[in-house]
Design a protein with these regions (language model features):
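Detector for Asparagine
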Residues: 18, 64, 94-97, 144-145
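Membrane-targeting and insertion segments and their boundary/processing signals
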Residues: 11, 81-85, 89
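Sec-dependent N-terminal signal peptides of Gram-positive bacterial secreted proteins and lipoproteins
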Residues: 2-24
Length: 156
């Protein structure tokens, strides 16, 4: 009896291993945009990029407190909660890219070569969850097979 289910168990283990190898979740070390890591301090961002073009602080129910937004020009925005970067958005080709070198204007093929198949596609958004925390990750908005916008950090 035992000999009959051992091959099934082995086949199931192989299938499970293959499924996890194919997962596209990214490590937290991939959550970097423009040299700024998820969780970087606002002070560090100012050291790297200087004084923001605009600073706005407002109450945000999601984070149950104040959120401070830094804008650099009209295409690079960072949101800080308690002084730490929780969301970065790049909305135009401005030389700012991810740790894997993806920037606005990169091809969808380049995104997939860097990160694999997305964990989820929602409309024109290709979503890659962080393997340690599914509430954070990378989102690439794709228009005409090119990256039109990049979001990094909290995905809510």
């Amino acid at each position: 009896m035992m000999k009959k289910w051992i091959p099934s168990l082995a086949a199931g283990a192989v299938l499970t291993m293959n499924a996890s190898i194919c997962a596209a979740a990214v490590p937290s070390s991939a959550l970097v945009a423009g040299g700024i890591e998820y969780g970087a301090s606002a002070d560090y961002v100012r050291q790297v990029y200087g004084t923001p073009t605009e600073v706005e602080t407002k109450h945000h129910t999601l984070w149950n407190g104040e959120v401070t937004e830094y804008e650099y020009g009209d295409s690079f925005e960072l949101k800080f909660v308690d002084g730490y970067a929780r969301h970065i958005e790049i909305s135009r080709h401005n030389g700012i890219n991810t740790a894997a070198g993806i920037e606005v204007g990169s091809t969808l093929d380049a995104v997939k070569a860097a990160y694999g198949e997305p964990d989820k596609i929602r409309g024109d958004k290709y979503i890659y969850y962080c393997d340690e925390d599914k509430s954070i990750g990378l989102v690439f908005e794709i228009e005409n097979n090119r990256v039109d916008e990049i979001e990094m950090g909290y995905l809510g």
